[in-house]
């Protein structure tokens, strides 16, 4: 596993975006994406709704933030039930929300197995970007040290929203802190995308529509 650059910096001082870009530029690491989904186009093509729905950029961003806090709800297929815990939530005057998170997630190359994932999370509300920085260990709100599983490299994920208010585009990319690029990891990501219904459409969007908007979806 590559050296962890994130564990020592205090939460308020740590620059999530800078760390993500540093890792994205490192030739040793394994990148996937960026991936792009036109939300309304996909909904219209693959689903019938119980009431009229124009999914907005505001909704998409709300979905991203809720998923950040509750991955066990919005990406339930990847999270061990009961394993999520968050702490340290802070909000700055310029619309930046920061917290830390631990959960047990399916491993990328052994999805039948779960491993502990420890993450620094920052949501930039003004530009609608949320960054997840995997780290080897953090001290939680109880003063205990929580440590990530070492069976796979640390990874970072960035999600953001683009497009017009009534034509939102969801985008994301990942970076795995490997010793050298691993071509198997992009294949694993491709397999995950293809497992969604429809393929490539993130499961957290239909979950949000049915759970938070109270609109039922029926596949076409």
Regions found by a protein language model. Name each.
Residues 1-2, 220:
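Amphipathic, hydrophobic N-terminal targeting peptides for secretion and organelle import
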Residues 75, 103-105, 109-123, 170, ...:
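Charged, low-complexity, intrinsically disordered terminal regions
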Residues 92-95, 204-209:
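Short C-terminal domain-edge/linker segments immediately following a structured domain
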Residues 64, 99-106, 119-122, 130-134, ...:
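Polar/charged side chains located within well-ordered beta-strands of beta-rich proteins
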Residues 84-142:
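Glycine-rich portal/gate segments that line the openings of hydrophobic small-molecule binding cavities
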Residues 206-220:
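Short, highly charged C-terminal tails/helix-capping segments
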Residues 133-203:
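Beta-strand/loop substructures that line and gate deep hydrophobic ligand-binding cavities in soluble
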Residues 2-95:
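Hydrophobic ligand-binding cavity/cleft-lining segments
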């Amino acid at each position: 596993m590559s050296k962890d650059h994130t564990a020592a910096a205090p939460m308020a001082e740590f620059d999530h975006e800078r760390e993500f870009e540093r890792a994205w530029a490192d030739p040793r690491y394994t990148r996937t994406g960026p991936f792009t989904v036109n939300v309304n186009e996909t909904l219209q093509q693959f689903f019938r709704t119980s009431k009229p729905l124009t999914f907005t950029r505001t909704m998409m961003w709300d979905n991203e933030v809720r998923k950040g806090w509750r991955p066990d709800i919005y990406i339930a297929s990847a999270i061990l039930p009961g394993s999520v815990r968050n702490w340290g939530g802070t909000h700055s005057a310029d619309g930046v929300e920061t917290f830390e998170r631990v959960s047990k997630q399916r491993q990328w190359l052994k999805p039948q197995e779960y491993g502990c994932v420890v993450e620094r999370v920052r949501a930039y509300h003004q530009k609608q970007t949320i960054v997840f920085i995997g780290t080897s260990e953090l001290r939680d709100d109880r003063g205990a040290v929580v440590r990530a599983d070492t069976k796979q490299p640390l990874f970072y994920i960035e999600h953001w929203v683009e497009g017009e208010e009534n034509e939102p585009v969801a985008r994301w990319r990942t970076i795995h802190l490997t010793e050298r690029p691993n071509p198997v990891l992009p294949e694993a990501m491709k397999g995950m995308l293809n497992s969604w219904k429809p393929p490539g459409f993130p499961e957290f969007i239909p979950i949000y529509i049915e759970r938070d908007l109270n609109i039922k979806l029926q596949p076409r």
